[in-house]
UniProtKB/Swiss-Prot annotation:
GO terms for molecular function: 2-methoxy-6-polyprenyl-1,4-benzoquinol methyltransferase activity; demethylmenaquinone methyltransferase activity. It comes from the Bacteria. Pfam families: Ubie_methyltran (PF01209). Belongs to the class I-like SAM-binding methyltransferase superfamily. MenG/UbiE family. This is Ubiquinone/menaquinone biosynthesis C-methyltransferase UbiE. It is an enzyme of class 2 (transferase). Methyltransferase required for the conversion of demethylmenaquinol (DMKH2) to menaquinol (MKH2) and the conversion of 2-polyprenyl-6-methoxy-1,4-benzoquinol (DDMQH2) to 2-polyprenyl-3-methyl-6-methoxy-1,4-benzoquinol (DMQH2). The gene is ubiE. The lineage of its organism: Bacteria, Pseudomonadati, Pseudomonadota, Gammaproteobacteria, Enterobacterales. Keywords: Menaquinone biosynthesis, Methyltransferase, S-adenosyl-L-methionine, Transferase, Ubiquinone biosynthesis. InterPro entries: SAM-dependent_MTases_sf, UbiE/COQ5_MeTrFase, UbiE/COQ5_MeTrFase_CS. Pathway: Quinol/quinone metabolism; menaquinone biosynthesis; menaquinol from 1,4-dihydroxy-2-naphthoate: step 2/2; Cofactor biosynthesis; ubiquinone biosynthesis. It catalyses: a 2-demethylmenaquinol + S-adenosyl-L-methionine = a menaquinol + S-adenosyl-L-homocysteine + H(+); a 2-methoxy-6-(all-trans-polyprenyl)benzene-1,4-diol + S-adenosyl-L-methionine = a 5-methoxy-2-methyl-3-(all-trans-polyprenyl)benzene-1,4-diol + S-adenosyl-L-homocysteine + H(+). Its EC number is 2.1.1.163, 2.1.1.201. S-adenosyl-L-methionine binds at residues 73, 94, 122-123, 139.
Length: 250
């Protein structure tokens, strides 16, 4: 008897779990070239402030070992690279080769070449020994994970005892008027902007849908609290449009 394969969300649609990673990869292959430009335009540059706050919340020590997970084009890696010394290092890991290539070029153009390593891998199966990293940071990548519980378990394994996980992710606006404006802008403007700038209407349509179905800050905090992590907390930024979650391995 043929076993029916489990389905998972892909924006507002459902696809086979085995297909989602390749579909996500196709999306980022399509948008990688204009990815940074679109981030600036879509957020009016505010994403830079969000990422600065995220790095500040990490309280980076110069000799930390940090995993920038789902690193994309390297905005977080670039910020962190200025804060570590010769004893510390950063691993920039992403499943998408094109995004990692842009990341590497961006870091090198910034003048930083030491103590940064680039790895293409699936975050469900992190290719590291246990208890390596002082912190793991996921910036706008968590909602794209297919098996979130597996990813959290994998992250937990590679963190040192006392290490922390930080997640910056889109969330739910706290105020009704902001929610209405945000929804109108997201659904009616962002896909059209994506089409004009990068020629990828449907990639940015998926982006908006993935944000909409992502758990609220309270629900994600509960997911983290019910996992192996401890002391889960979050802060809202920009009226809850995004939130930073922080939890620890003890």
């Amino acid at each position: 008897m043929k076993i029916k394969e489990k389905m998972t969300d892909f924006g507002f649609s459902y696809v086979k779990k085995s297909k989602k990673n390749s579909m996500i990869e196709d999306i980022f292959n399509n948008v990688s070239y204009k990815y940074d430009l679109m981030n600036d335009i879509m957020s009016f540059g505010v994403h830079r402030i969000w990422k600065n706050i995220l790095v500040y919340c990490n309280s980076t020590n110069p000799d930390q070992k940090i995993l920038d997970l789902a690193s994309g084009t390297g905005d977080i890696t670039k910020r962190l690279s200025k804060l570590i010394n010769k004893k510390g290092f950063i691993v920039s890991l992403d499943i998408n080769r094109k995004m990692l290539k842009i990341c590497r070029k961006k870091i090198r153009n910034s003048g930083t070449i030491r103590n940064i390593f680039y790895i293409q891998a699936n975050s469900e199966y992190l290719p590291f020994k246990k208890n390596i990293f002082d912190s793991v940071i996921v910036s706008f990548g968590f909602r794209n994970f297919t098996e979130k519980k597996k990813q959290l378990s994998s992250i937990f394994n590679v963190l040192k005892p006392g290490g922390k996980l930080l997640i910056l992710e889109f969330s739910k606006p706290l105020f009704e008027f902001l929610k209405k404006i945000y929804d109108i802008y997201s659904f009616y403007c962002i896909p059209k902007m994506g089409n004009i700038i990068s020629g990828n209407y449907y990639s940015y349509k998926y982006l908006v849908e993935s944000i909409k179905i992502h758990p609220s800050q309270k629900k994600l905090n509960k997911i983290l609290s019910e996992s192996e992590f401890c002391n889960s907390e979050y802060i809202n930024i920009s009226g809850g449009i995004v939130a930073i979650h922080r939890c620890y391995k003890f």
